[in-house]
Amino acid sequence: MWRFPLILASVCWLTTAQQQNVANDPDKKLASFDACKADIHKHCSRPDVDLTSDMSILECLQDAGFSETATLSEQCEQLVWDFKVKITQDERFVSAAKQYCEEELKGNAAMNLCTSQTQPGFALSCLMEFTKNVTETGKCHAFLARTERLAFSDFRLVGPFVTKCRAILDKFKCNVLTPDPAHKGVRVAHTQGMALECILDKVVKNAKTQADALQILGDDCKHEVLRLAEMQADDFHLDRPLFFACRLDRERYCKDVPSGEGKVFECLMMNRNDKFMDPECGNLLAERAYLMGRDYRMAHPLTKACQPELTRYKCEPQNQIESAAHFHLAWILLCLENGANQPEHKEVQPSKECAHEMITHRQMMMQHFRMAPELVLNCAQEIDKWCSPRGDIEAEGRTLHCLMEHAESRNETLKLGAQCLQAVQQVVKVADIGRNYKVDKVLYGSCRSLIDGPCAQDAVSETATLTCLMRNVDSPDMVPECEKRLLEVQYFMARDWTMDPQLYEACHQEAVSRCSALDNWHQQHNSDNTVDRGPQVLACLYRSAYDEQNPLSVKCGTQVRQLLHVRAVRVNLIPEIEDSCREALSEFCSHNVKPSEEMMCLQQNFETDNFKRKHPQCFAELTKFTEMEAKDTKLNRALSKACKPVISTHCAQFANEEIDHGDVLECLVNNKDAKEMNNKCRSYVNHFELISLRDYHFSYKFQKACASDIEQSCKGHNNDKGEIIRCLSEVRFEHKVLGSPKDLTDDCKKQLKVAYLQQEQVEFDDKEHMADADPKLSQKCEQEIKMYKCNQADTFEDTIECLRLNFEHLGPECKSMIFYREKIEAVDNSMDDELQKKCRYDIGKFCANSDSENVLECLTNTKIVRLLQRECKAIVKERMQESARDVRLRPQLLTSCRKEAEQYCPEDMKKINMPQYSQTVLDGVVVSCLRDKFRQSISDQNHIDFSPRCSAEVSRAIVEAEFDPQLDPPLYNACKSTINDHCSATIMESGGHFDNVMECLKNDFNKGLIRDKQCSEQVARRLQESLVDIHLDPVLHEACAMDIQRYCRDVPPGHSRIVMCLMDSADKQELSKECSTKLSDRNKLWMKAHSEFQMALPDSWHAFANLVMEHPERNSILGYLAGFIVFILLIGCCCGRVSKKQYIEMKNR
């Protein structure tokens, strides 16, 4: 930039002769003086120069070059100065003004007062104030405009400026040609307009350290400087340094732009970052931009186009202190934007011209950071350090984006200071990129390929295009530079709700009423001293968008959710999370974690005790967000993107809902095996499943459906979902099995089942997270999980199944945790996912009509269990063995026999209802007692009577044990060694099945091969149980099935009636050979059990006689009986019909 001192005292370079010439002949024309003839001929011999007009010649000569000293001869330079003084400062100027502006002076009293100013240059200065008020086409305007051009070439001609700024000119040495007397007589260049330029240079340099850089001038001089700067900003020709520095650039970029109203300056500013622009022109434009930022009145195109709007929206500053923030261009632009968006102004929008100028000036502000004085002041260090390493202005208008990049940095050494950050935020707000992204040329240029490509169809508005860009931020089409610039802009938009025009329009009233937002958000200061809370307003709107008790309006709620869906792509676009979690991100997510995966990283760690202790605020914010995410799956951008094929095919009906309330995730869980499911989607689904398992609040439907039940029954279990599931399951179990009056609501029952199955089916991408499925169970079974290699399982249910298979070897605490799960699955078989999966085919084939909650009852039917597929049979037998351990795992038996159990087994019933035994397996309690009573019911003398339902359930338990001795724990535990020693060959012969174990034991018992007395006692017990009813001896029942149909069809079961009926038929030799043989074998066993272990026999004598007939010593016994019968016959012969009648009665008995 040119910098030459200016001398104020004309006496130093005026010659007395020239003064006398001009003074002596005041009417002589400039062209007639010999001093300038050569210069006029050289520079002004053009058709457009009127050589008869001194004004026209003066304009031509001063336009010949920036430095008149370098352009004109010494004599002509002095003569030009004399004529400028003559034209502008003596009484002839006033006379001319009265001539050309006669009408205007009559109509404007204030303007007329200017003609009474007598001090040199004061009348000129005063009249220049009214140039913009006179008609542009009139002769007065032409006169004043041409005079202004002369005055602005040398500010010594402007009297008030010289007077009021003399001290400043001296202080900054803006008035000294030769600072050293030794230079006396040396001709130093005089540069047009340089006095003001010298002052402006000092002001701009001072702007880096002073809030009000103009304050160094003092109030009087500052007023004059701003006044002159405002006037010269209106006309390109008045800004002489700019005129000469940008003369070629004006021809290059703004050839067709007419001078006046600041149009040329605006055009040059829009092209300032072009690489072909002259650097000197660019530097001067930057200085002017700073002044325009300080005083909006220098933005003439804006003030003229928007004058009605400035008045209507009350944006014109009321106090006239130029240093006030209300004079800043940023404030004016914000005020105009705010006014246009106020409901009362909706019907009268800004004119097209005003809207255009607003966009243009916003665009200039994005490109030229100097237009924001606060930015120049508060970001000077940051700009010098990071954005202008060579001390120049960063090319292509990227300074602001450079600062924006550092604003979002998490590296404390690279972050902006608080004041600079606030200044950047203010500029971004003024630019209003959300309304028109094109004001940000850097963003527009970086994202052009996407704007013209994937987002072309969204170009219905600039706002829609910007939203489209955000939707594609992680798409393959996104280019790194666009992503970077887009997220820099979104970082600030995410921290000020007013920067999103659609959100502002939809939610303005609710933001003010519900979230304490300022009604007029452009105001930096207000009477109530209320500060717009920025991110807090957005956070409030986010929470309110999912508040179903007090919801936002449909329009606002929809807009907030759509916005949050877009911004959930990055943690730093959710300020309440990023600001609270910076340390946590650094600790847990700083290595090999992509920005798009930071949320997942935080969620994987945030529920650990260590995290909660070190980062409580971060934990609280993540909890709030994850609750919203559980309610609205679209917030999980990574999952939504990875699972798009599955969602489109299987979950579209849920995805299209405004809020899916977790249905999409539930659908994805249910479709993990779908062909559209990919590894990435499955991983994201597993991730969120694990999160939701840690805290029941993260399962929206579960939380909502079970809130009252949790409050009533599970209040002391905190938020651990595993504990809540256990607690609710216990409530349901106690109601259904133990008869407790308290039960769950129907909705909670449904969601409990969903939650339980979700817990069962969760998979582990990382085995370290296995414990998250049920932390308490994992803790109490930690050793067992390692010991039996259950940690190698792929799903949680496989881990549990592994522990169930090793139940007898588990520690007490681990047993209690597994027992909890066994109980709820016994109550509702549909919650037994392992059973449902492995028996799906057999359930469909054999149990299609069975209640899903009790499908195990169907599968364990002795006629069905032998026909099941191998995998299903194995799991069914495992469940049968589990149910044999504790009567509470046989809910059907317990409910059917409740009356009998309370009558015959009161102590046992009391025990299973005691809280201290709720987690303890009570082997044989109730069942052993009921079976014992059932056995005793063989004798009528015991007066034991079982209801049909109870009798059927006890019989079922006995029959099931016939096929698997493990279902009779007392027998199996007593005979385990005998089975291993004696029956292993029999098992192998049957193909590995246990169906023949009981037959093997009975055979050994008959032969006396069982040496273990306890085992023999248990076999004898089993024989007595089977004697109660033939159905309890499946082998005998199968052998005699046809005979029972033929001879005992009408005999009711129980109390050995059918057995006695068959014995009676055997006496008559009516039975089939197979049945007779098997009955004879069983009779031997019964008699042996009776003789050795006092097994009770039926009360009927006849039945006993039939048993005796099959006794091993039956020959001698029958001999005695035959003699007795002969004796009776002899008596009958003697007594006739009396004896016959007695015989008949005996026979009937």
Swiss-Prot record:
GO terms for cellular component: Golgi membrane. It comes from Caenorhabditis elegans. The keyword Glycoprotein applies. This is Golgi apparatus protein 1 homolog. It is a single-pass type I membrane protein. GO terms for molecular function: fibroblast growth factor binding. Cys-rich GLG1 repeats lie at residues 24-69, 71-135, 139-207, 216-276, 277-344, 349-411, 415-475, 477-549, 551-610, 613-676, 677-736, 743-803, 809-867, 868-938, 945-1009, 1010-1070. It is found in: Membrane. The keyword Heme does not apply. The chain crosses the membrane at residues 1116-1136. Residues 1137-1149 are cytoplasmic. Residues 20-1115 are extracellular. Glycans are attached at N133, N411. Keywords: Glycoprotein, Membrane, Repeat, Signal, Transmembrane, Transmembrane helix. Pfam families: Cys_rich_FGFR. Residues 1-19 form the signal peptide.
